[in-house]
Amino acid sequence: MKKHLLAGACALAMGFAVIPGTFADETCNSPFTTALITGQEQYLHVWTLGMPGVGDESDKLVTISVDPKSDKYGKVINTLSVGGRGEAHHTGFTDDRRYLWAGRLDDNKIFIFDLIDPANPKLIKTITDFADRTGYVGPHTFYALPGRMLIQALSNTKTHDGQTGLAVYSNAGELVSLHPMPVTDGGDGYGYDIGINPAKNVLLTSSFTGWNNYMMDLGKMVKDPEAMKRFGNTMAIWDLKSMKAEKILNVPGAPLEIRWSLKPEHNWAYTATALTSKLWLIKQDDKGEWIAKETGTIGDPSKIPLPVDISITADAKGLWVNTFLDGTTRFYDISEPEHPKEVFSKKMGNQVNMVSQSYDGKRVYFTTSLIANWDKKGAENDQWLKAYDWDGKELVEKFTVDFNELKLGRAHHMKFSSKTNAAELGTNQSFPTRQ
């Protein structure tokens, strides 16, 4: 096993010799993703948590038509249940964009869907031994590398706290290498999101909390002083080719999503801290050293609005920021990255979590679920997908898909696809049957 992982790590490093430079599609895709949508997305895939007593109660991939020219616009056209409830959370495309990987934070299963026919996704492989083979728990972020899938976990099998690591898999679903989160030189060992700037040979990671916390009821957790101490307060700068952590950045308050500027001349990224409601800029200073700088507040931090997902515009002049507990989305002018200005806000509902925007910035989509035990209860448990047009000043609602009414479950992570680029997708992958 060690020889296999070492060989895989060497192959991984060699794979970065050619750096692609094209960005399109969703603005949070890995820069190594090809076959990008350059026009109107046609389908939206929503990785959805099953709910007890609702529909088939299973986690599922829900596909919605988002093409205004379609007679099924705004309608669910496909649901693919995967069986059971394991805390469905995030997804990510392989580099050739044919396969969508989707993870569950509780039972650690990973599902690989073939999207050669995006209106009818097919489940072609389930990885059931992620925790056993890696020692990690909670496969959270799925980030494409050349011929590989980089997975950021949230926890571990021994203590279920936030000590965790990164796992690299082949596109065929075979484990290649493991990379523990740094615990020296100020590292706290926590993980959450991944963001890569290939031009700088930089992998940036953020930090959240472990299984013991994220599977706890939110109301119970916030009243537990010890639990509230178990959140990450760092981000790590890694050498991408060697997969070695080089510097730890102090970013207190659980820095979550990472969004690099997509402009080639830029060398900065944004994140938001969940517990302190702050915006942070990660950049190089005049000496070329990577630093983290607090740049602003989100809402009223004293009320703990709980910032969650963020989305950067393709021109790097705007940033969407969702706050879960007050159900609000905000848009910031970040044309001066060190001086963000809130220029728009809208109350979306009782809760809001994920946000995805088209590359041209004209269409924005929102979903509501965060984590099953953290979502609001009863009548406040909004579960929907909403689609909007954005003109730079106002959000104009186009349609809503009510996941409660349709008995689908909790709407979480979104990914775009289109049948127009199916011919460009990678060839059919051979998936070994050995787990």
Swiss-Prot record:
EC number per UniProt: 1.8.3.4
What activates or inhibits this protein? Inhibited by EDTA but not by EGTA.
Which cofactors go with this protein?
A: Cu cation
This protein's record includes keyword Oxidoreductase: yes
Top-rank taxon? Bacteria
> Where does the record say this protein resides?
Periplasm
The record, for InterPro entries, names: Se-bd (IPR008826), WD40/YVTN_repeat-like_dom_sf (IPR015943)
Q: Which reaction does it catalyse?
A: methanethiol + O2 + H2O = hydrogen sulfide + formaldehyde + H2O2 + H(+)
Question: What is the recorded function of this protein according to its Swiss-Prot or TrEMBL entry?
Answer: Catalyzes the oxidation of methanethiol. Can also degrade ethanethiol, but not methanol, methylamine or dimethylsulfide.
Supply the PANTHER family for this chain.
METHANETHIOL OXIDASE
Protein name per Swiss-Prot or TrEMBL: Methanethiol oxidase
- Source organism: Hyphomicrobium sp
- Lineage in the entry? Bacteria, Pseudomonadati, Pseudomonadota, Alphaproteobacteria, Hyphomicrobiales
Gene name, Swiss-Prot/TrEMBL: mtoX
